Amino acid sequence: MAVTMEEIVAHAKHRGFVFPGSEIYGGLANTWDYGPLGVELKNNIKRAWWKKFVQESPYNVGLDAAILMNPRTWEASGHLGNFNDPMVDCKQCKARHRADKLIEKALEEKGIEMIVDGLPLAKMDELIKEYDIACPECGSRDFTNVRQFNLMFKTYQGVTESSANEIYLRPETAQGIFVNFKNVQRTMRKKLPFGIAQIGKSFRNEITPGNFTFRTREFEQMELEFFCKPGEELQWFDYWKQFCKDWLLSLGMKEDNIRLRDHAKEELSHYSNATTDIEYHFPFGWGELWGIASRTDYDLKRHMEYSGEDFHYLDQETNERYIPYCIEPSLGADRVTLAFMIDAYDEEELEDGTTRTVMHLHPALAPYKAAVLPLSKKLADGAHRIYEELVKHFMVDYDETGSIGKRYRRQDEIGTPFCITYDFESEQDGQVTVRDRDTMEQVRLPIGELKAFLEEKIAF
């Protein structure tokens, strides 16, 4: 059955995946805290990304750059001049809207598909009037003209709030990679092609955040900047598109819920000569998970111009000197975590007429890899010994409260792939019952084989 966003939000809060931020003070709009299970799920996703994009990659190395950077960075990157969203205000209720999304949603409701992102502001004004678009909040059709709104969060470094001390929270992790290109290339003795990967927080003062953790002002990115010889960028662009899609599928995401969408010319960012989004079919519609962009040599050239640093690369095979081109697969950690939660959530009708809620998370992503359940509290000592051994290697839950059936259901709801039941026979034969979350089938296994069994099941 199709899940709604309301069901996902309720389940996430009820089971400790995601809580509203600052909840005891009435919250802060569009801020979310990852609970005990949410932080495990998100961390497992980040580990899975790092494993395939860095650890197992012959090309890529990692970086963790500072959030606060010299403001000249953002002049060079174009963010101070170009990092804007089109904004429009309702004159009646004062609600503020991102103009392109307002228009796209209104047209979609009329059965018209149109990409508005990238259109001139005057054209957006025309579309609002032409299609008689109303404010979603109050129904008024009286809007201001569309204008640009810079998305960067400004703050001050030091004790005085003067323009000389202005700095910005980074709107993307990519620029920390570009300014360190030479440091990484020299110290790691990398030859092209090679990539630099980073996971970190970014901040954008979004006009209309929403849809739970899909669009927030504070978010986490998993980005790769992959540098190659000019002229080879499109073959690497295709390579990384497929690699990214395969990564999602290898972790169990349903292929029917994924599509690749190429950006039209008018949509392209100022630095890109080709961009493809990997989109996921959320309950509210298709939304971007992964942006894969060919950024050409724009960033390195700009930082050369503004810093005076030489980013030319000497190709020792051809003796050529050139500025490398760059392919950027940029994935939102919060968005992909939400997508995996939605993709895994199911309410199954069982043969006895009852319904069970289950999250079919890939075992590599599941917050707990297993739960140890003593059949009776009298068996707690033996069950605890198994738990204490397994937690040296995996995240494992221990639960001795309630009937075994209710405990199974609790673990199904949080996506635990295997329940290990320690019963009275276990005391005699040294074996336990292992229940599979998805099939609900049960097998007996020797206690000594549990570690190897779980290691095999969580591999991807």
UniProtKB/Swiss-Prot annotation:
Catalytic reaction equation(s): tRNA(Gly) + glycine + ATP = glycyl-tRNA(Gly) + AMP + diphosphate
Main location: cytoplasm
Residues holding ATP: 204-206, 214-219, 288-289, 332-335
Cellular compartment(s): Cytoplasm
PROSITE patterns: AA_TRNA_LIGASE_II
Enzyme class, broadest EC rank: ligase
Signal peptide positions on this chain: none
GO molecular function list: ATP binding; catalytic activity, acting on a protein; glycine-tRNA ligase activity; protein dimerization activity; transferase activity
Parts forming coiled coils: none
Keywords: Aminoacyl-tRNA synthetase, ATP-binding, Cytoplasm, Ligase, Nucleotide-binding, Protein biosynthesis
Record-level GO cellular component terms: cytoplasm
Residue numbers binding substrate: 98, 172, 219-223, 328-332
Biological-process GO terms, alphabetical: glycyl-tRNA aminoacylation
Similarity comment: family membership: Belongs to the class-II aminoacyl-tRNA synthetase family.
Subunit structure: Homodimer.
Protein's name in the database: Glycine--tRNA ligase
Native species: Geobacillus kaustophilus (strain HTA426)
Lineage summary: Bacteria, Bacillati, Bacillota, Bacilli, Bacillales
